[in-house]
């Protein structure tokens, strides 16, 4: 662009120079006297020449401008292509970077997995090392024991054979009475075991001669006999133990123990005394000749704050309590005493029941009414004794005949008011 402007200036400068030169030329002419027609023609020619030159210069300048614009357009087109190429290369670089990031993530995952596996392998290697160290220690111990056995010449090899087993006499055990004897017996058993182990043949069956085969047959027969004897002894011992366990004495002892646990000895003696027919309770001198009487009459004065109805209810409550105590003692006696004693008690109860029935028939005739105030405690004692004995007899009758109804003694109170 700068060069084109300089060239345009050059084209303009010569035209201006020509114009300057042309007007200077007529300056000397005034000395001469030219004609005015000639002067007009020369000026017109000069103007035409200047116009032609200006048109040419403008045309050339326009051509140059067109060329310059074409060049600029080409340069811009090239720049656009280069920019497009740069954008494609940048996109390719971005794709490569994304691929690299993906590869890096996958490699990081694989590296983490490898690290975990390496840790596990290291843990396994440590465990293996520990096991190997333990095995080395055990091997060293075995080597030491082996060396000691070889030095002592006590190296033994035991081969299990179904036909030739260890004799049963070695395994027979007797009861140990004391600690010292037990130690001696253990030492003897160990010696016998060692002897039998030494006697075991280690050679194969092919190398044995016929005489040794005969000896083995005899040994097998002896072993079978010893086994049969063992089985017989064990069975006899078991039978004896069962007989002892289920003997009558052991059962009686166990029953007595259970009875003592349920009922104490003192209580049992009291129950026995109460069941014996010859046993008689102490009674007052003024009592009736018959022990059991279903009817009894007593007299009491009515004191202050008490009524006849309250006295009757109290006496009935006492009668019920006595009956409950009698039935409870009889139940305990049946649970604690053995079968033989229970049979005897049942017979005694039958006898006493019969006596009670007989006495009940005759006691209806003897009814005493005491009216003296001084004999009131004696009458109370008699009434309590009659209640106790009648309750006992009724309980015995209930044991023999549960279907019969209980006969309650009728207590009749005669209250006198002064």
Swiss-Prot record:
Region annotated Leucine-zipper, chain positions: 62-100
**Could you say what a knockout of this gene produces?**
Mice show loss of endothelial caveolae in lung and adipose tissue but no effect on the abundance of endothelial caveolae in the heart.
Q: Per UniProt, what is one GO molecular function of this protein?
A: phosphatidylserine binding
- Post-translational modification, as annotated: The N-terminus is blocked.
Tissue expression remark:
Heart, adipose tissue, lung and endothelial cells (at protein level). Highly expressed in kidney and expressed at lower levels in liver, spleen, thymus, stomach, intestine and uterus.
Question: What are the start and end residues of every segment in region (Disordered)?
Answer: 1-42, 200-238, 262-382, 396-418
Q: Where is the composition biased (Basic and acidic residues)?
A: 220-238, 303-321
Coiled-coil annotation reads: 61-87, 126-268
Per the entry's comment, what about the domains? Answer: The leucine-zipper domain is essential for its localization in the caveolae.
Q: What does this protein do?
A: Plays an important role in caveolar biogenesis and morphology. Regulates caveolae morphology by inducing membrane curvature within caveolae. Plays a role in caveola formation in a tissue-specific manner. Required for the formation of caveolae in the lung and fat endothelia but not in the heart endothelia. Negatively regulates the size or stability of CAVIN complexes in the lung endothelial cells. May play a role in targeting PRKCA to caveolae.
Its assembly, as annotated, is: Component of the CAVIN complex composed of CAVIN1, CAVIN2, CAVIN3 and CAVIN4. Binds to PRKCA in the presence of phosphatidylserine. Interacts with CAVIN4; this augments the transactivation of NPPA by CAVIN4. Interacts with CAVIN1. Interacts with CAV3.
Name it. Answer: Caveolae-associated protein 2
């Amino acid at each position: 662009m700068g060069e084109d402007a300089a060239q345009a200036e050059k084209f303009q400068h010569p035209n201006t120079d020509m114009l300057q030169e042309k007007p200077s030329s007529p300056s000397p002419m005034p000395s001469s006297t030219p004609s005015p027609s000639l002067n007009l023609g020369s000026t017109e020619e000069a103007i035409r020449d200047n116009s032609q030159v200006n048109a040419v210069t403008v045309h050339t300048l326009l051509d140059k401008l067109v060329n310059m614009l074409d060049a600029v357009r080409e340069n811009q087109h090239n720049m656009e292509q280069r920019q497009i190429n740069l954008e494609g290369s940048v996109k390719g670089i971005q794709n490569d970077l994304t691929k690299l990031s993906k590869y890096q993530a996958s490699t990081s995952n694989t590296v983490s997995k490898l690290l975990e596996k390496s840790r596990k392998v290291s843990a396994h290697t440590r465990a293996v090392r520990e096991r190997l160290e333990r095995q080395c220690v055990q091997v060293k111990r075995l080597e030491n024991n082996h060396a000691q056995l070889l030095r002592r010449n006590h190296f033994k090899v035991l081969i299990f054979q179904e036909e030739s087993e260890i004799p049963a006499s070695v395994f027979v055990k007797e009861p140990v009475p004391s600690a010292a004897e037990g130690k001696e017996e253990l030492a003897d058993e160990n010696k016998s075991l060692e002897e039998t182990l030494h006697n075991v043949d280690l050679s194969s069956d092919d190398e044995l001669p016929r005489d040794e085969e005969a000896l083995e047959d005899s040994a097998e027969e002896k072993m079978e006999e010893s086994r049969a004897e063992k089985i017989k002894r064990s069975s006899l011992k078991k039978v004896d133990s069962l007989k002892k366990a289920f003997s009558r004495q052991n059962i009686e002892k166990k029953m007595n123990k259970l009875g003592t646990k349920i009922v104490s000895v003192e209580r049992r003696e009291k129950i026995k005394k109460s069941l014996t027919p010859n046993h008689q309770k102490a009674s007052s001198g003024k009592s009736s000749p018959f022990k059991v009487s279903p009817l009894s009459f007593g007299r009491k004065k009515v004191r202050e704050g008490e009524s006849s109805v309250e006295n009757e209810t109290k006496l009935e409550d006492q009668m019920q309590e006595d009956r409950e105590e009698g039935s409870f003692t009889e139940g305990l006696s049946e649970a604690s005493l053995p079968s033989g004693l229970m049979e005897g008690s049942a017979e005694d109860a039958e006898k006493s029941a019969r006596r009670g029935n007989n006495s009940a028939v005759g006691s209806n005739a003897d009814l005493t009414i005491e009216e003296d105030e001084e004999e009131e405690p004696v009458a109370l004692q008699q009434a309590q004794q009659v209640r106790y004995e009648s309750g006992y007899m009724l309980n015995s009758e209930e044991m023999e005949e549960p279907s019969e109804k209980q006969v309650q003694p009728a207590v009749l109170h005669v209250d006198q008011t002064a």
